[in-house]
Structures are given as structure tokens and as C-alpha cells.
């Protein structure tokens, strides 16, 4: 699992699939944790473009362990990539087990919101944002990424998001000078720019310059 996460953060789609594929023959449904291996394999297949196989494996993992949020997430990716919006909503709504006690819960709610966004059901998207996505005002970077990217998508579609950017920017502020991970910084920059916090945006840009020179 640690290797799978490393492959994810380095963007190595081939190894996301193949690292798990190599050990899969040594696993079976009689071995505890088999569902987790299938969930990782499903995500690797999806990221490699093998949507049919990825969906099948992901659904099998969830059937074995309904609260496997990573397997749920892998199938959500497939349905999103294929534009299967109604099926995506049904998939996420039909299994409430992923919503409980998981660091991935907010991100999975975000995936559900994307399906509603494609339907231009902005009222539901904003309700999801104000509820399970950002209602708890979380400060984890992975949750702030989801908040920023969803507000950005809404704004690009001309939706008035009110003052929601302000709170997101305030929570990103503690990480503005880190300059450690460009993906995070880009999402922080969205919040700073859209909330008018040019001071934080300047600090973020300077942190990026320092990091690039190291």
C-alpha cells in the first residue's frame, strides 16, 4: 500500500497498476485484506485507461468490503471518465458505507458533486460543498484541494459562490510559504487569487521560486 501511494504521488500510472498486478496471484478472497489489494489494482487499471477491467475489479472489491473507500473511488473514476453521470450518482448514493470514518470521504463526496456539476445541478453541488465537502471547515491539504477545485469549476461556469473562497484561502494560508508540492500550491493559488489575497499569492510565488532553486 505504501508503494501504491508512492506511485500515486509520483504520477506513475504504469506502476500503480503493475506493482499490484505482480503480487495479485499470491492473494485470494480467503486472505484478509484481499479487497484492499483489488481496490488498489482497480485504481491502477483505471489510471492506465483500462476502464472495463478497472470497473469490474473495483466493484468486486466493494462487494467484498462495502466500506473500502479506495475501491469505491476507483469505480467513481471510471464512471466519471466515461461520462456515465447517472450511473456515477447511483454508484455513490447507493453505498453509504464509504461515507463513514474515512480520510477519503470528502474526496468521494467531491466525485459525487462532479457528476451533479456535469448535469448543471448547481444547487445540489453547492449543497454538497456546504455540507460534507467543506461544511466542517477542514484544514487537511487533500480536503482543501477538493474545496478549491470545486469552487473553481463552479466559477468557470458562471456560478456565484459568494464568500466561500475567503474561508478556503484562510485555511490555505498556513501552508502558503511551504513550497513543497506544486499541486497543492496551485490549488492554494486559486483560493488566494479568487479571494483577493494578493499578499498570500505573492508569498506563495516566492516560496515556489525558493523551492525551484534548491
What are these regions (language model features)?
Residues 1, 30-38, 66-73, 101-109, ...:
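Generic helix N-cap/helix-start motif at coil->alpha-helix transitions
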Residues 1-9, 39-40:
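Non-membrane alpha-helical segments in proteins
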Residues 7-22, 43-55, 77-93, 119-129, ...:
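Helix-turn-helix repeat elements of alpha-solenoid scaffolds
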Residues 23, 27, 60-61, 94-95, ...:
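Canonical positions in the second alpha-helix
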Residues 26-66:
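Hydrophobic secondary-structure block in the mid-to-C-terminal portion of proteins
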Residues 51, 65-76, 84-111, 126:
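Long all-alpha helical scaffold domains
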Residues 114-214:
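Helix-coil-helix junctions within alpha-helical repeat/solenoid scaffolds
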Amino acid at each position: 500500500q505504501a508503494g501504491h501511494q508512492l506511485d500515486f504521488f509520483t504520477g506513475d500510472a504504469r506502476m500503480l497498476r503493475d506493482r499490484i498486478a505482480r503480487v495479485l496471484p499470491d492473494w485470494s478472497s480467503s486472505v484478509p485484506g484481499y479487497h484492499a489489494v483489488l481496490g488498489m489494482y482497480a485504481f491502477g487499471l483505471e489510471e492506465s485507461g483500462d476502464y472495463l477491467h478497472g470497473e469490474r475489479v473495483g466493484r468486486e472489491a466493494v462487494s467484498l468490503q462495502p466500506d473500502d473507500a479506495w475501491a469505491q473511488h476507483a469505480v467513481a473514476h471510471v464512471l466519471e471518465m466515461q461520462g456515465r453521470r447517472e450511473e456515477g450518482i447511483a454508484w455513490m448514493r447507493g453505498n453509504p458505507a464509504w461515507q463513514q470514518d474515512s480520510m477519503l470521504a470528502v474526496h468521494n463526496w467531491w466525485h459525487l458533486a462532479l457528476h451533479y456539476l456535469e448535469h448543471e445541478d448547481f444547487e445540489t453541488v453547492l449543497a454538497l460543498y456546504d455540507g460534507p465537502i467543506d461544511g466542517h471547515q477542514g484544514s487537511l491539504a487533500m480536503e482543501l484541494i477538493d474545496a478549491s477545485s470545486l469552487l473553481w469549476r463552479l466559477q468557470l461556469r458562471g456560478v456565484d459562490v459568494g464568500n466561500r473562497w475567503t474561508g478556503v484561502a484562510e485555511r490555505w494560508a498556513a501552508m502558503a510559504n511551504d513550497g513543497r508540492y506544486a499541486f497543492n500550491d496551485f490549488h492554494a493559488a486559486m483560493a488566494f487569487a479568487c479571494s483577493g489575497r494578493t499578499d498570500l499569492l505573492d508569498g506563495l510565488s516566492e516560496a515556489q521560486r525558493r523551492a525551484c532553486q534548491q
